[in-house]
Amino acid sequence: MNILVLIKQVPDTNEVRIDPVTKTLIREGVPSIINPDDKNALEEAIRIREKVGGKVTVISMGPTQAEVALREALAMGADEAYLLTDRAFAGADTYATAKALSKAIEKFQYDIVFCGRQAIDGDTAQVGPQIAEQLDIPQVTYVRKVEIEGDKLIVERALEDGYEIIEVKTPVLLTAIKELNVPRYPSIKGIFNAYNKKEVKILTADDLEVDKNELGLKGSPTKVVATSTPNTERAGEIFTGNIKEAVQNLVERLNSRHVI
């Protein structure tokens, strides 16, 4: 079974900064990680390959430094890695990102396209479903369990108050949530092979054979008006006096603010 896994290198959420001029995330010089939900997608793809055979290919779109994320994916157990990188991709919204990724996916034979539910730097959860739409294949989102039965999958999809069990044939796109599994740590051998024996192949806009006006900022119908970080500062208050008085004052204050 051939599985494509889409991963994204995202800023570590503990180090998020906003450019005051462009109102977008500052990514340069910020520690980056593989998007957490994407790791769950990759782990499940590797588990499926271990059960039924096949190949796991990871694909990412981003600047050249995204190669680090792809190397980590190779160390975890992916077989091949491709990086979509080109100035033509810069400034892409979810629609233009899905356009580029779907064009890349069309170059591969695949049974499953796996991606995370959403990226922690945007939280839109749009790219996966948009890719499925552009590829004209079925999709199952919020996946928490996958079983293989021949050429079809039995998938559990999480809901707010329960779950659905869905039977779907391949090819199909799945979006993973953290309840799906616990991603493995790369082994020493895996890390060595990822950096010494495996290659990260580059795909540019020219390789996708698509009108560049449909990519990047030019191909993005969504325009970011503003981005900001929430104020995390909290005012503190100290209640003095004996314990009984302090507790009474605390209860009165909480009541006045309708907390209790």
Swiss-Prot record:
The keyword Nucleotide-binding does not apply. Binds 1 FAD per dimer. Binds 1 AMP per subunit. It comes from the Bacteria. Pfam families: ETF. One of its GO terms (molecular function) is electron transfer activity. PANTHER family: ELECTRON TRANSFER FLAVOPROTEIN BETA-SUBUNIT (PTHR21294), PROTEIN FIXA (PTHR21294:SF17). Heterodimer of an alpha and a beta subunit. This is Electron transfer flavoprotein subunit beta. The gene is etfB.
